[in-house]
Swiss-Prot record:
Its EC number is 3.4.21.53. One of its GO terms (molecular function) is ATP-dependent peptidase activity. One of its GO terms (biological process) is cellular response to oxidative stress. Residues 811-995 form the Lon proteolytic domain. Homohexamer or homoheptamer. Organized in a ring with a central cavity. Residues 102-313 form the Lon N-terminal domain. Pfam families: AAA, Lon_C, Lon_lid, LON_substr_bdg. GO terms for cellular component: mitochondrial matrix. This is Lon protease homolog, mitochondrial. Belongs to the peptidase S16 family.
Length: 1002
């Protein structure tokens, strides 16, 4: 059989050489193995007769046919002599032109051109069996038709809808509708498993369906339209196709053998087959190839083929240019590398330059030499070992980079380098007072720290935790402390931190390992005694990488941080001189072991007069200058600031107050610009709002030297006596509440901006703009009227008040008592209301509403029990609690409430209802009560006192255990209040219901 194949190849050398390449177009362009497999598989007779291209290598078509017949006879004779292949040889085979009905085979990817092989896979076993049977019956032909896409779909997009069934699942008419009418009569040359190898013969057109499964159709054989072989246009087009194919051959050697065969024997080829060849070997879209297959006009077919091969040539050139560019880049890099290596070698021989390792070692030794006297011995030993190791490593190894980075960190740290501290208490007092108003507890603690350092001659690291609500200046005061002590400042936030490695560092074995935050801090500040601010320590996270709070235990323990061990450095670091300042909003969220290591300084927030001072002297001035407004152009009166504080900004801090003042001045700036004002800039600085300053809201109350109007304050520290006198001068502001009418100071006659003048809607209309432009032209030389903001027009700038009056009753009715509560925004008043729901013998009960927590519900139950006992003692004949169902309610039902401090207030409310007596006017109370009537201490004394003053309360009842907390308050907070400290509820009873019994008053 191999001899037969060789004989056929000798007769048709070009046909056997080019045929495998045609099949390669359809699949992965490597079908030679399949064809050779077919030759070895016993299909020599059929393959030998049909494995050829559609043009002969002899002179004419008749001679080619005679030569082909001889080759077929030789192959057949050889096959008959072979016993293994005798069953596959059929003496008489149906001629192609006699095939009028064929089995339709769908081609999903590309059409089959006459003269080309194509392997396909048939999954339908019934169809495969029919093909095998036809071969046995000497009908080795089938129709190959390209599958067309469904109507309305983009052929370039693959869909996965239900209607887009697999072509193997379609039968009968459904399959016929998906096939192109024009296809190719294909000879089945080989069937191996589910693989069928087809050889294209001639064009077909479907006329009708004969059988549904397998799909069998009647066909008409199509012939090319007559054409003149000597037509110059056809010749020129064919020559252009051949020339383009040669260009493709130059750009890509993929089809080298097949293109060379065609171009060398172009006189032996007819034009239609040349067009088919060009389309078949191109990588064009399957629908463009189908157009070539359907075209029967030879000239048009050549034109279509020329377009396809031109595109193929452009793609080949593009591929060639890309490959050339990559090759040039690679060769250039190699050449550059070689020259650099040669240059290094020459410089090294001449002694002009050392290698990288020597230069690195010299740099590291130079760094550590300056710190050698202060650097610990164990650190010097590690550095020497690593330098020796560095010399032994290759520069290209990964371990070299790890060692280099490790040495870089070791040598850059400030071993034994401390900044000179300033132990001047008066200097520190001045700086703290300049930067912050109030916060006396924090300032006093810092001054104590400085005083101890002055007496000892040195200072030790401390761990201070500033706790308080947002916006009170916790973060910014850390920077002020560093400035007062002349220490470097470093801040990092641990809010949401869940990875221990952020604090302790990564092991050096990990790729991209880095030291922890403390080592990075020391490198950044360059000293070993900085002030480190650990922000949001109450918001530490916890994840799979460990517990950062536990990692901070070593860092914040004065007994352990002397030898703090970072995982990356793996050498002890002395952090005992570092002053740690932590900030937190809620200390209850800090783990107890960590909380035990810190000294807590609570910042309760600012009272009204402190906010007034900050707003008037700090925020208002800074914001006005930041907006480019001059003092003579706008003014915010004290009455407006007071209304702003009490009706818009009741939170403990001043961040929201700062935002509201900025809002006012932005609107004033817009008004002035619309009036034609254009201030010349006084300094080369961009106008930004105060909230965009680097320190954010916490720095809003920071008083800078350049913004102080009084020169005397720039050179003198404010002493405690001065502070007290200044606070006393502002006591009149505290006596004014939201409920009272606030009368602003008499404003100048320049003019107060009215509501109509402020209407931005009117200003934004075209008529308003024209009016302003006209007014500007008429009064260009006139002075712009001063904008004055007071309580009457404040709402035009900041909107309606956020907070309403907390005091609901001027005189509380029967069953209603005012209590005092603590919230995250500071203190507030809280009314307790009780009423009788039902009355009858033995119907005594208690109903509670107001979204109360479990602790508060228990307090109400205790209050009900204690109230019954007290009523029985005071009025034995009164059976109110035994026969009445009481409903207790706490207003603001949408707000969750909890805590035990309302116990005494609940008892008083129930007793007021039971006795039918209202409590004393302007009375507020707070305190936890026990079943025996004892009053236990509560928290938030300062906040609750401020809330009572804000609601014009004159008499307050506190537990006796809180007397010390109250005594520590500033005099201006306590002034004007009648405060009673009680141990038992009987004392409260006497106060609330105007008994003659008097308790200790402040």
């Amino acid at each position: 059989m191999l001899r037969a194949a060789a004989a056929a190849a000798a007769v048709f050398p070009s046909r056997f050489a080019a045929a495998p390449a045609v099949a390669a177009v359809e699949e992965v362009r490597s079908p030679l193995l399949r064809v050779l497999g077919a030759l070895r598989g016993g299909r020599v007779s059929t393959l030998g007769r049909r494995a050829r291209f559609c043009s002969n290598s002899a002179g004419s078509d008749s001679e080619a046919a005679a030569a082909e017949a001889k080759a077929e006879d030789a192959v057949a004779a050889e096959g008959e002599a072979d016993g293994k292949a005798s069953s596959a040889i059929v003496p008489t085979v149906l001629r192609p032109e006699d095939c009028l009905s064929v089995i339709a085979l769908p081609l999903p990817h590309r059409p089959l051109f006459p003269g080309f092989y194509m392997p396909i896979y048939v999954k339908d076993q019934k169809l495969l069996q029919a093909l095998v049977e036809n071969r046995k019956r000497s009908i080795p032909y089938a129709g190959a038709f390209l599958v067309k896409d469904e109507e309305g779909t983009d052929p370039n997009i693959v869909t996965s809808s239900d209607s887009d069934k697999s072509i193997d699942d379609l039968k009968g008419k459904e399959l016929l509708q998906r096939l192109n009418e024009v296809g190719t009569l294909a000879q089945i040359t080989s069937i191996q498993g589910d693989q069928v190898v087809l050889l294209g013969h001639r064009r077909l057109k479907i006329t009708e369906m004969v059988q549904e499964d397998p799909l069998t159709v009647k066909v008409d054989h199509l012939k090319e339209k007559p054409y003149d072989k000597d037509d110059d246009v056809i010749k020129a087009t064919s020559f252009e196709v051949i020339s383009t194919l040669r260009e493709v051959l130059k750009a890509s050697s993929l089809w080298k053998d097949h293109v060379q065969t065609y171009t060398q024997h172009m006189g032996d080829f007819n034009y239609p087959r040349l067009a088919d060849f060009g389309a078949a070997i191109s990588g064009a879209n399957k629908f463009l190839c189908q157009e070539v297959l359907e075209e029967l006009d030879v000239y048009k077919r050549l034109k279509l083929t020329l377009e396809l091969v031109k595109k193929e040539m452009e793609i080949s050139k593009l591929q060639q240019s890309i490959a050339k560019a990559i090759e040039e880049k690679i060769s250039g890099d190699q050449r550059r590398y070689l020259l650099n290596e040669q240059l290094k070698a020459i410089k090294k021989e001449l002694g002009l330059e050392t290698d990288d390792k020597t230069a690195l070692s010299a740099k590291f030794r130079e760094r550590i030499e300056a710190k050698k006297e202060k650097c610990p011995a164990h650190v010097l030993q590690v550095i020497e070992e690593e330098l020796t190791k560095l010399q032994l490593l290759e520069a290209s190894s990964s371990e070299f980079n790890v060692t280099r980075n490790y040495l870089d960190w070791l040598t850059v740290l400030p071993w034994g380098n401390y900044s000179d501290e300033n132990f001047d208490v008066h200097h520190a007092q001045q700086i703290l007072d300049e930067d912050h108003y109030g916060l006396s507890d924090v300032k006093e603690r810092i001054l104590e720290f400085i005083a101890v350092g002055k007496l000892r001659g040195t200072s030790q690291g401390k761990i201070i935790c500033l706790s308080g609500p947002p916006g009170v200046g916790k973060t910014s005061i850390g920077r002020s402390i560093a400035r007062a002590l002349n220490r470097k400042f470093y801040r990092f936030s641990v809010g949401g931190l869940a990875d221990v490695a952020e604090i302790k560092g990564h092991r050096r074995t990990y790729v991209g390992a880095m030291p922890g935050k403390m080592v990075q801090c020391l490198k950044s500040v360059g000293t070993a005694n900085p002030l480190v601010l650990i922000d949001e320590i109450d918001k530490l996270g916890r994840g799979h990488s460990g517990d950062p709070a536990s990692a901070l235990l070593e860092l914040l323990d004065p007994e352990q941080n002397v030898n703090f061990l970072d995982h990356y450095l793996d050498v002890p670091i002395d952090l005992s001189k570092v002053l740690f300042v932590c900030t937190a909003n809620v200390i209850e969220m800090i783990p107890n072991p960590l909380l035990d290591r810190m000294e807590i300084i609570a910042i309760a927030g600012y009272i009204t007069d402190e906010k007034m001072h900050i707003a008037r002297d700090y925020l208002e001035k800074n914001t006005r200058e930041a907006c480019g407004i001059k003092p003579e152009q706008a003014e915010v009166t004290d009455a407006a600031l007071l209304a702003l504080i009490e009706s818009y900004c009741r939170e403990a801090g001043v961040r929201n107050l700062q935002k509201q003042i900025e809002k006012i001045y932005r609107k004033i700036a817009l008004q002035l610009v619309r009036q034609g004002v254009s201030n010349e800039p006084t300094q080369e600085a961009a106008i930004v709002t105060a909230s965009e300053e680097p320190n954010g809201g916490d720095s809003a109350n920071k008083l800078k030297d350049e913004t102080m109007e009084d020169p005397a304050t720039e050179n003198a520290a404010m002493t405690n006596a001065d502070t007290a006198s200044k606070e006393a001068s502002e006591l009149d502001l505290l006596n004014r509440t939201v409920d009272h009418d606030v009368h602003p100071a008499e404003t100048p006659k320049e003019a107060v901006l009215t509501d109509s003048a402020l209407s931005t809607d009117k200003l934004c209309t075209p008529e308003g703009n024209k009016d302003m432009e006209g007014a500007k032209e008429e009064s260009a030389d006139k002075a712009v009227e001063k904008v004055v903001i007071d309580s009457s027009n404040l709402g035009d700038y900041v909107g309606k008040p956020v907070f309403q009056a907390e005091r609901i009753y001027e005189q509380t009715p029967v069953g209603v008592v005012m209590g005092l509560a603590w919230t995250a925004m500071g203190g507030s008043t809280l009314y307790i209301e009780t009423t009788k729901v039902e009355e009858g013998d033995g119907k005594g009960a208690l109903v509670m509403t107001g979204q109360l927590g479990d602790v508060m519900k228990e307090s109400a139950q205790i209050a009900h029990t204690v109230g019954r006992a007290i009523l029985l003692d005071k009025e034995p004949e009164n059976l109110f609690f035994a026969n009445s169902k009481v409903h207790l309610h706490v207003p603001a039902g949408s707000t969750p409430k909890d805590g035990p401090s309302a116990g005494c207030t609940m008892i008083t409310s129930m007793l007021s209802l039971a006795m039918g007596k209202p409590v004393k006017k302007d009375l507020a109370m707070t305190g936890e009560v026990t079943l025996t009537g004892r009053i236990l201490p509560i928290g938030g004394v300062k906040e609750k006192t401020i809330a009572a003053r804000r609601s014009a309360v004159k008499t307050i009842v506190f537990p006796a255990a809180n007397k010390r907390d109250f005594d520590e308050l500033a005099p201006n907070v306590k002034e004007g209040l009648e405060v009673h400290f009680v141990d038992t509820y009987n004392e409260i009873f006497d106060i609330a219901f105007q008994s003659e019994t008097q308790t200790e008053t402040s």
